[in-house]
Amino acid sequence: MSNHTMLAVLAHPDDESFGFGATLALYADSGVAVHLVCGTRGEAGTVRPELLNGHASIGDLRWAELACAAEQLQLASVTHLGYRDSGIDGKGGEGTGEMPVLAAAPLEEVTAKIVWHIRRLQPQVILTHDP
């Protein structure tokens, strides 16, 4: 068993699969503790109502899909940063009082949350995508 740690920092559920799912799975399978920090729950996506499969919202569906993907990819943990998705145009508004929109959040605030996870996990490798 390896004592190495990898951290993926991504914006939405499904970024882990579309972006570099095979890489995450490869390292997890080799014994690396692979963790994911996800900025949003993907609430601004679209899905036909009949495809919600009993989930109360798109965010709930997307988070459930992420949980399934995390299991298949053998991720050690998945953490939500506490932001709402803004949508593809980045104009998702101010968010709710409980959950601000990631695209509108102060850079210093988002950075501090990510740095907290980096310090907690102390990964040797961090993967992310461009803004």
State where each predicted segment sits:
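Extended, charged catalytic domains and RNA/DNA-binding interfaces, predominantly
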Residues: 119, 123-131
